[in-house]
Amino acid sequence: MTKNFIILTSNINYLERIIDNDLFKNKALVDGSFTTWVVAINKDCPPWLTTNKSIAIRITNHPVVDELCLNLGGPIISTSANCSNQKYINDITTIENIFDGKIDCIVKGQLGNEKKSSIIKNILTNEILRH
């Protein structure tokens, strides 16, 4: 199964070229939960980034993501390290063994405090896509 990209950022201003920040600020930032939001892309979003006119966005305060975004001057593009319908993986050795030779880079650092995957919500409908 092909997984869609997730945009991770510590700074909402980095999203200006990808999504409508006003809607995102008004809805997602008020929520405050550990949530990934599916939002409509704007006309400036690179076409290779999505196939369905929407993209997943997660604002995070994780120090490793914050440092990466700061050094790159923008958000980072990620995907899930978990296989569909499989147990949540949070051990780097297990990830390296399962995805041997299939991942270009693994950034080593402390994991966040969350014990499960984030909730995924559609920002327009508030529909929960994953709980």
Regions inferred by a protein language model and the residue ranges of each:
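Active-site-adjacent structural elements in enzyme catalytic cores
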Residues: 1-131
